[in-house]
Each structure stands twice: as C-alpha cells, then as structure tokens.
Amino acid sequence: MRVDAIAKVTGRARYTDDYVMAGMCYAKYVRSPIAHGYAVSINDEQARSLPGVLAIFTWEDVPDIPFATAGHAWTLDENKRDTADRALLTRHVRHHGDAVAIVVARDELTAEKAAQLVSIEWQELPVITTPEAALAEDAAPIHNGGNLLKQSTMSTGNVQQTIDAADYQVQGHYQTPVIQHCHMESVTSLAWMEDDSRITIVSSTQIPHIVRRVVGQALDIPWSCVRVIKPFVGGGFGNKQDVLEEPMAAFLTSKLGGIPVKVSLSREECFLATRTRHAFTIDGQMGVNRDGTLKGYSLDVLSNTGAYASHGHSIASAGGNKVAYLYPRCAYAYSSKTCYTNLPSAGAMRGYGAPQVVFAVESMLDDAATALGIDPVEIRLRNAAREGDANPLTGKRIYSAGLPECLEKGRKIFEWEKRRAECQNQQGNLRRGVGVACFSYTSNTWPVGVEIAGARLLMNQDGTINVQSGATEIGQGADTVFSQMVAETVGVPVSDVRVISTQDTDVTPFDPGAFASRQSYVAAPALRSAALLLKEKIIAHAAVMLHQSAMNLTLIKGHIVLVERPEEPLMSLKDLAMDAFYHPERGGQLSAESSIKTTTNPPAFGCTFVDLTVDIALCKVTINRILNVHDSGHILNPLLAEGQVHGGMGMGIGWALFEEMIIDAKSGVVRNPNLLDYKMPTMPDLPQLESAFVEINEPQSAYGHKSLGEPPIIPVAAAIRNAVKMATGVAINTLPLTPKRLYEEFHLAGLI
C-alpha cells in the first residue's frame, strides 16, 4: 500500500489550499481580454472603494526585473540559462489572460469583484498564433529581439544522402495540438513573513528548491531569505515544473507588512495563464530498404512556445535527443526552431517533447511498412535498439535495451497476428484496425542539467527511521518507493520507515524536484548511500553492546543477527535505539546524510498495441483493447508501476482523440478554457487499460531501475493513428482525431 494512501483517502492530507492563517488575505488578477497589445490607461477607483480591498498593484508597482520561470537546475554557464522574459505584471500583454494588475482583499469574493471593477483602455497590436506567421519578415515582434526564441540542429552526417540512397522514401507533415495538463488541484501559493528579512511560501509545486531560487531572483533578494514549503500536491504533470504564482505571493506579502496572502487560480486561469503542451509542426523524411532496414530519417520541427519562453527550446531539443535512442543504427538529423506567438505560454508536460516527435517517427515508419508489405511489428524489431548500441548523436552506450522483448511480449499477449488477420480486406461502415508504436526516453536531464539529490535518515527512539528527501512527491508514489529502498538497504520492515512528504527548503536536503522521470533514478544513489551509512552505524553500535565484531553482525527485518545464524535475533532495533539515545556514555542519535550527483542517464523503452473500431459514418473511434509494454529496468513496486502506466495511457488517449485548446486564429482568444468545453476522456471513454513489463537490470542504476513516470503517454497517439490508418486506409497526421477531423479526412479520401 502507498505510504500516503490513508492520509489521502481520509482527507487528512493537507494541500496548499487547505492552509488558512489568521488575517490571511486573497489576491485576484486583472487579466487581458486581448492577446496582444498595450494597456493605455487603467482606472481602479471603483475597485479601491470597495470595502475589504487592501491594495491594488499594477505593472508600475512591481520590480523591473525580468526572470525565467522554467524549473531547471541552475547552471554556472550563462549561455545555458533559461530565457528571462517574465515580469510579475506587464503593460505589454502578449496573450489572452496576461496579467496587468492584481487586487488584494480581505476575502476571495471581494478580491474577485474588485478585479472585475478595474477598467483598462487597450491599444491592440497584430496577433500571431503560429510559428510560420511569427517567422514572417513583416511579423510584429512579440519580444525585443524578434520572434525566434532559439534554433538548433543535430545530425549524424550526410543524412539526406543516406535517405535518398534507400530503396524507399516516405515523407510526412505532422501537427500536434495545444493541450492543458488538467491536474486535479489548481495552482495555489500562500506567502507570509515572520520577520523583516525572510519570506515563507507554501505552494503546490514540483520544484520547491527551484522556486526558492527564482523568487529570490524575481525580487532581487538573497535566495536564503526565501523558505518554500511543499505540502501534498494534487498532480502537476509538468505544469508545476514552472515557477508560477510564488513570486507574486512573495511580492504581495513583502509589500503588505508580511501579512499572509494567498494567490489561487481558477480552472479558467490555469488554461490561460499557466502552461500548455507545445504544439509542434514536423516535416519528416525517412529512407527504408525493401527488407525493412531503416537507413535514415530527418525531422524539421517548428515549436510554438507561446507568449513567454518558459521551458522554451528545451522541449523541442529534448524531443529530438530522446528519440535518438529508439532506432540508433541509422542516420539521423534533427533541426528545430522555437518561436514566440500570442498563445498562452507552453512549458513542460508529461513526455517533454517526446510524444510529438514519436508521433511523427512512428507514423512514418508505419507508412513505410505498409508500402513495403512488412508487418509493423517486424519492421520495428529489425531496427529496435539493442544492448551495446549507442545514441547516434552523443555516442552514449546503451547498457540495457528491452525493446525487442517488449515487442515480442506485447505481440504474444495482444495476439497481434490473429487480430491483424481479422482486420484485412474490410468493407462497410464499421472497420477494425490494429496499430503499434514504440518509444525511447531518458531517466533524467544529465548532461544537459546538473543532476543532484540529497537524503537524510534519522533513527527514532523506537527504532523506526525518518527519511527526509529533497525529491518531491506529487502523487506519483515516490515516497512509497523511497521507503522501500531504505527498508531494503538498511534491513528493516517497510512499515518502520517514514518518509517526510512535506519538503521545506530550510530543512530538506537539496534536490531540483520532480520532473524528467528522474525522481527514483537520481534519488536512489543518495538514499542508498545514506541507508548504507546508517546501517554501518547501527551495526557498529550493536557490536559495542554485544561485545562482538561488527563483521559478524548484520541487520535483518529490524533485528540484529549474527551473519552465520540469521534466523536467531540477538536484539531489536528498538532496544538498540534506546541504548543509543539514553546510555549515559555511548551512542547518540544515529543518523546519516548523503548528497550525490548522478552522471548516467540510461534510456527506457516500450511500445503500445491497440485494437480499435472506426465508425465511418459517425466519424468515431472506439478503442477495443490497448496494451502498453515497458522496459523500465527492475520494477521496484509493481502496483505503482501499473498505476503510472494506466495514467499515462489515459492521457495518451486524450491527446490522440479528444483534447485540444481551441484558440481563435485571428484574435488569439481561447474558446474553451474550462472542463466543460475542453474535452477530456472520462471513465466511459476509456477501455480497460492493460500493462506489462520486461524487467532487464540496468547496471548503471542503484536498484536496477530506469524511468517510468512519463514514458507511458509517449507512443499511444501514434499507435492509435496507425490503427485508424489500417482500418480505413486514411493516414491522418494531425491530432487530435476528433469526429470533425475524421469527417474532413474521410471526405477528402472519398469514404463519405
């Protein structure tokens, strides 16, 4: 059972919005109804006269300090730092919902009403919604310096020549949508001051230590003057890997004498003013020989980062790097540009660029297989990464690669050949199809980012162990896995290990946070090191108590035993702990601490199999069966792993078939910023989600494991697209596959 399960299901778990303090005030934004322009004048007299309003701040009142919001580890290399293009408030609004002012009042309703009473005169500017328009010669600059945020190129050599020399070439133009994370818990921050020099922030964040640094930068105060507390978090999926409302909450309390101020966003504001998934436009080419050997492929990517950089070009660049592991024995070229537009800012979201890139690669490879008459599973088996291969861009060796085994296992469980045979030569309105797609991903951000984790273990008087880790539990089950790691390494029952889930930057060891599927992989070395050190101290103390050599003793199930007679307990850990605490001379509280930097980053692999039915007349896709198979190394907790995979599959189905932020191409206004009009799949829309694992030990890992948090979403959309193509003969390269899009594509193909 998860270590946090009881607290959550009973309601005892405290989330940020559960924190209420005496004298707490509430802040609400005044936001732009236009996507691009200037606030010419502002009239807040009516709002200020409302009883209960404490203050109103505009762009003229906030520090003139641009800051970056992306949740990346800090770097000493100035050229690698995130783009600092944000201000707390702005006169130059760059997207629908940009913030120009903020109202602080004694209660939330008064703050909302006062914000609505603020009137602004606007000067509108041309609106740009696509990267193509942003790069036009006559495009209005959204930021000083132009609309091209950054571009990069990666290549293994003369890739075009290799593609042209292959027996068969395939090209494709692919488009993916802007979507929102839709985590259950909204974005909320609460800040106050307990003395004149320090600000305390409670926030729903994936990155407490990074929040501390960014707040310091945004307000130009020492980082040590900021304390960030992360309580329970109701999901993030990358949205909370940005520093969102914490700088504003800190600014407000500093201006209002240190009183507690809460900034809480509505669901509509989460759509408009937090982060989205980058929309990609991808032009791809691929060269394949008649026997199915992939000779080379190239991708040209345009990434839409919206109004502010946030994670910016990192998304497009990372997507190209992560997919390089998938089919590493071929030529590969990847070029990408990231552009500013007048859309809500895009940032990190589960998969970090990989779902978009894999959609293009796996669609092209499937089209090549169809044209060459090759089984889609066989063409992937022929080219799949194997142990001993290397990333063609970086030369990093692959020490564990279970992709072939994933395909073989999935093919057997899914009954691929039988189902595929049943889908041949179909006529009529209802048509079945099967599809498959693969992925590769990484286990952290190294070497692009510094990967560091810290852990502190302290023994209590009853022999139980408290664990403090900088790694952030945001609902993914990290604390449960950490307790297992410590329990196994020290030699105690899992029930005797308590992970302190609330991070506090004043107390908790340093760790950048929860992102990049890094938590268990990067935290494991620090936890293991601290656990081994604590075990060594325990045995050393036991040796003194028992007049034995430490070499003769070990710790099993919370008891000191002789190595040669492990079945005979000599002493309980509780008895040892009491002696260590209270003996008049020897011992002391037994504790251990470790901080370790990780310099390895193994790839994880996997695939999705899907069986679906297309109702051509209704333009509707129904998934009959879907299976994900993953190589994530040694599976530390099968139940948690299954939950991770099911969650990712559900999100992948949403991205493939349902979800899209509808943004007016002319005005930049978001038309569906709510959960009624933004169509997420609900339980009746989802089939039974199946998962399986291929456990291959990763030798670079502390416990033989690799990433699993993000990968399950990555191949789902491509597999669904490929199954729809098999069912109908129509290759649809734009997501999502909504009834409207299916109607348009089927009409063009002459099916309706």
UniProtKB/Swiss-Prot annotation:
Pfam families attached to this UniProt entry: Ald_Xan_dh_C (PF01315), MoCoBD_1 (PF02738), MoCoBD_2 (PF20256)
An example Gene Ontology biological process: purine ribonucleoside salvage
Key word Calcium present: no
Gene3D superfamilies from the UniProt entry: Aldehyde oxidase/xanthine dehydrogenase, a/b hammerhead, Aldehyde oxidase/xanthine dehydrogenase, molybdopterin binding domain
Binding locations of Mo-molybdopterin: Q206, F237, R350, A516
GO CC terms of this entry: cytoplasm; xanthine dehydrogenase complex
Protein name stated in the entry: Putative xanthine dehydrogenase molybdenum-binding subunit XdhA
Cofactor note: Binds 1 Mo-molybdopterin (Mo-MPT) cofactor per subunit.
SMART domains on file: Ald_Xan_dh_C
NCBIfam families: PRK09970.1 (NF007426), XdhA_XDHase (NF043082)
Assembly: Heterotrimer of XdhA, XdhB and XdhC.
Cofactor(s) demanded: Mo-molybdopterin
A single MF term (Gene Ontology): iron ion binding
Family designation: Belongs to the xanthine dehydrogenase family.
Protein induction: Is not solely regulated by nitrogen limitation.
Metabolic or biological pathway, per its Swiss-Prot or TrEMBL entry: Purine metabolism; hypoxanthine degradation; urate from hypoxanthine: step 1/2; Purine metabolism; hypoxanthine degradation; urate from hypoxanthine: step 2/2
Name of encoding gene: xdhA
Entry EC no(s): 1.17.1.4
InterPro entries: Ald_Oxase/Xan_DH_a/b (IPR000674), Ald_Oxase/Xan_DH_a/b_sf (IPR036856), Ald_Oxase/xanthine_DH-like (IPR016208), AldOxase/xan_DH_MoCoBD1 (IPR008274), AldOxase/xan_DH_MoCoBD2 (IPR046867), AldOxase/xan_DH_Mopterin-bd_sf (IPR037165), XdhA_XDHase (IPR050028)
Lineage, broadest ranks: Bacteria, Pseudomonadati, Pseudomonadota, Gammaproteobacteria, Enterobacterales
